[in-house]
Amino acid sequence: MEQDFQLVSVDAVNAKHVGTVFRSVYGNDFPIQYVYQPEAVAAEIAAERLTAVLAFDAAGQPAGYVSMFKNAPNFQLWEVGNMVVNPVYKQSRLSLLLANCCQNAELMNIAGSDGLYSEAVCHHYMTQVGSAKAGMADYALEIDQLAGSSFKEHCADTERISCVFNFIEYTKPSLPTYIPNVYEDMARTLLQPLKKRDILASTAVLPQQGNLRQEEKYYEFAGTWKLAVWETGATWSEDVAALLAEAARRNVVSLQVAVNMALPHLGAAVEELRKQGFFFGGVLPRWFGSDGLLMQVVLGGEPNFAGAKLYTQTARTLRQYCQADWELRKT
């Protein structure tokens, strides 16, 4: 007989059960240690940086967990986080129930957000399939983003792992989306599944005044450095060169720059990135509230495009496009 489960939002009262679920799979070795600390889990939820659901079995024992968290420059975006199922229930429908929680705005406490995204790993198909079933579309391909050695489950057979950026949109953006001429056709294709927005050609030149305004996330253990550029400023060429020099000093492998697509001079900013070796990654919808254009470079070796296992035709088309753009940069 099929096991019944009760799904409840995580709060300060039941947060003590989160660690129990993680221990059933990882022992005490899950790298994000706050999951074992009820007070820390409750604090993240209170600060609206985390939202999560627990599943309890018929006996009232914690059986599963799914979470979302905020990791984008736009605080109105949620990223699909961890899903953990006690091995006792691996053959049950619990994984599906937890995955479906991501579409339940009330249970997950995400009502009013701009959208939901995930970065689906490409050394197997499972996460990509789950994202597609949840109604997400593919918008970007982050080449060689993660270190393969960091995966104990579903061990990777490549040194680096790429990720597909999936997204589903809940609100309409208020700002226009500028697209560079060099990527116009692909950008328009990627934007099609989203809500209607004003799409304009980017023809403005780089500004002669103003300062670079950006946010960054540096993951030393993964060799990954991500930057979100709100404004390019007056010294964009020099800033890009300095970024590449610093990335080399840090032994970064995956360097990603998302540029605000609300900038009228986006095309000129992208052209400078291309001149210095960056190639196309895709679109990051609502990354700034407005959309973002992802440019990337793989340092220390050639990108492993062929190593990515891609589920959808969109992702496979995107790989061909990214690789062709990289080939142009190489020459």
Briefly describe each language-model feature range.
Residues V80, Q91-C102, M108-N109:
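Glycine-rich acyl-CoA binding loop
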Residues C122-A140, S150, P264-F280:
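Conserved active-site alpha-helix within GNAT-family acetyltransferase domains
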Residues E106-V121, R250-N260:
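Conserved GNAT acetyl-CoA-binding A-motif
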Residues F5, S9-Y89, A120-V121, E215-T224, ...:
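A conserved beta-strand-loop-helix scaffold within acyl/acetyltransferase catalytic domains
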Residues L146-P180, G289-T317:
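C-terminal "cap" of GNAT-fold acetyltransferases
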Residues R188-G282, R286:
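Non-catalytic interaction/regulatory modules that flank or connect domains
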Residues M1-D4, D11-G27, S174-L206, N211, ...:
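A short, well-structured alpha-helix characteristic of acyl/acetyltransferase catalytic modules
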Residues Y117-E119, G135-C155, F279-S290:
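Conserved catalytic-core motifs of GNAT/GCN5-like acyltransferases
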